[in-house]
Every structure is written in C-alpha cells, then in structure tokens.
A protein has these predicted regions:
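N-terminal, polar/charged subdomain of small-to-medium soluble alpha/beta proteins
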Residues: 1-99
C-alpha cells in the first residue's frame, strides 16, 4: 500500500512522519491486496475549540473510498483517533462486500 503524507503550510518533523508511516502501515492488517493508496493531509486550524491540529486520511479501497477527518490538540492524538474510525469503517465495508 502506497502512503502519501502531506503537511499544509508547515514542515512536519521526520520523527512525526515516521510515526504516521508506522500507523498507516498497520492498515495492511485490515485491508486486502486490492486496496489502493492512502493519503494523509496534516493541517493547522486556528479557529477550533476541539484542537487546532487536523488530520484527513483518505483510503482508496475497491467499491468505495474511506475518508476520515479528525481534530485534536496533537497530531498524534488525531491520527490515533482516525485509525480507530478507519478500522470500524473497514470492518463495515468488509461485511457489506462479503454479503
């Protein structure tokens, strides 16, 4: 699975990019070999009470695309929360596809 990480209007540290890559690599357990690319967009939102760090993850799978947008006070927290949501959506998509 090809992972593309993009930070908007700031430079993400190598340590954080490695953290993000590791998290996205874990998705391999939940998707089959037909899954496409994963796009991760990191951006800062100055006007948010829930946190100013925004992570948008798009996963291209056969039949549909899964997109999650999560806000938090840290990018790590936003990615962790997004991963939980993506796992649930993948399970739903698998159940739907197997019917």
């Amino acid at each position: 699975m090809n992972v593309q990480i993009q930070s908007v209007k700031f430079d993400a540290s190598k340590q954080f990019l490695d953290f993000s890559q590791k998290k996205m690599d874990r998705l391999d357990r939940f998707v089959d070999e037909r899954a496409g690319d994963v796009e991760v967009v990191l951006r800062l939102d100055p006007d948010s009470e829930k946190g100013n760090k925004v992570v948008v993850i798009s996963l291209h799978v056969p039949g549909s695309d899964i997109r999650v947008e999560e806000r938090a006070f840290t990018f790590e927290e936003a990615i962790d929360n997004s991963m939980d949501i993506i796992k649930r959506q993948l399970e739903k998509a698998k159940a739907k596809f197997e019917k």
